[in-house]
Amino acid sequence: MTIRVRFAPSPTGMLHIGGARTALFNYLFARHHGGQFLLRVEDTDRERSTPEATKVILDALDWLDLKPDEPPVYQSTRYARHREVAEQMLAAGQAYRCYCSREELAEMRAEAERSKKPFRYDGRWRDRDPAEAPAGVDPVIRLRAPREGETVIHDLVQGEVRVKNAELDDMILLRSDGTPTYLHAVVVDDHDMGITHVIRGDDHLTNTFRQAQIYDAMGWARPNFAHIPLIHGADGAKLSKRHGAVSVLQFRDEGYLPEALCNYLLRLGWGHGDAEILPREEQVALFDLDGVGRAASRMDYAKLLHVNAVFLRAAEDERLAADVVARLERDHGFPVSTEAAGRIAMLMPGLKDRARTLAELAESALFVVREAPLPMTEKAEALLTEAARDDLAALLLDFDKTDFSKAALHEAMKAYAEREEKKLGAIAQPLRAALTGSTVSPPIDAVMEALGPIEVRKRIFSVLGE
């Protein structure tokens, strides 16, 4: 049997990290077992589902490198098939037409409230002669659900869960306008797509009993179900915007790497030893559902920042430099010349060691593209005393005698410090302030080599007032 799983988002908004983790678990499960990962867009909410929202979800999955093995299936294109299955159930006596009016249903709800019981349709049209149907009423089609016994689900994460059939009512399969309900459409689509494992959030667990009854009524084999716990905020409440970023593309825009976000989400609810950082190939090799816990996970943004910093330091300099250039132009409004882009690339080993996100990385590279005189932090300004400016003027003369390589510049600073009987830091920090406007940067000899003699001279002269 070939394992086939699916991720089935509704395009009514952004892809949130809970959905992203569900997609990741499906993807890794399929890859681990040599199976196939599919995508179904559940766009049956015709008012809220938009092409723009669909594109946002597809872009987010593409950014996370969770690409489906087949073209996406759009649920809205399958209404005829959903109706066909409902008609088959009618013909087999597994479903029936219900002509209840809105007023009758409202009275049932009111009675349930008075009795302090959950609302359930009372089945009044279950065995009634359709000849008694009122004129001008378009019926819904309801499942003829079993009333005796239990429906049992053997969940691969939650274990065995069961419900008494008397607690379930005859759910609607087709609305009066002929459109399918969500629960019916999902079952038909999963069956037709050959889905073997349904891996989704445990907020869908109660739906599974009703969906299992549809499978049974059609004589179809049920897929395996695995309901994974939800992600909560640090306070244990349902994750929301007040906790921080929740949209996948918001994390992208804030400068998180996709592989870092996936790594963090994987470890949020799945465990395998003490390893915190796992490349994708190791994730595929190790992942299986037996490592998924039942308890809700808590989002830890500080931990995610740490994980992102680890991946940032390991990322290729060329890739990071290209992203920084794009962010400087898009987010900070600085046109970046080819020369400046080259300087950023040269400095990337030192820049990325201090950054936790791509946004921070771009901030730290601003000094490269700014023109002299540079804006100064208070700490940097305080370093540029009269004595420090004298040192800068003298250092320029020594630098002019070098080939402006990093090693030669370092030796020139070291020799000057020894000659003046000063610590190297007392020389390097004012120089850093003059060249970057800050007290934090990559090694200052690397900064000078990247900027080049003309730019270094221009920046020091601007501090000296020349």
UniProtKB/Swiss-Prot annotation:
Enzyme class, first EC level, given as a word: ligase
Locations listed in the record: Cytoplasm
Keyword flag Aminoacyl-tRNA synthetase: yes
GO cellular component: cytosol
Motif segment ('HIGH' region): 9-19
Record-listed E.C. numbers: 6.1.1.17
Protein biosynthesis is among the record's keywords: yes
Motif ('KMSKS' region): 238-242
Chief site of localization: cytoplasm
One Pfam short name: Anticodon_2
Keywords of this entry: Aminoacyl-tRNA synthetase, ATP-binding, Cytoplasm, Ligase, Nucleotide-binding, Protein biosynthesis
Catalytic reaction list: tRNA(Glu) + L-glutamate + ATP = L-glutamyl-tRNA(Glu) + AMP + diphosphate
Binding site for ATP: K241
Biological process per Gene Ontology, one example term: glutamyl-tRNA aminoacylation
Molecular function as annotated in GO: ATP binding; glutamate-tRNA ligase activity; tRNA binding; zinc ion binding
Superkingdom in the source lineage: Bacteria
PANTHER family tied to this protein: GLUTAMATE--TRNA LIGASE (PTHR43311), GLUTAMATE--TRNA LIGASE, MITOCHONDRIAL-RELATED (PTHR43311:SF2)
Similarity field: Belongs to the class-I aminoacyl-tRNA synthetase family. Glutamate--tRNA ligase type 1 subfamily.
Role noted for this protein: Catalyzes the attachment of glutamate to tRNA(Glu) in a two-step reaction: glutamate is first activated by ATP to form Glu-AMP and then transferred to the acceptor end of tRNA(Glu).
Quaternary structure and interacting proteins, as annotated: Monomer.
Protein name per its UniProtKB record: Glutamate--tRNA ligase 1
Protein's organism: Acidiphilium cryptum (strain JF-5)
Gene that specifies this protein: gltX1
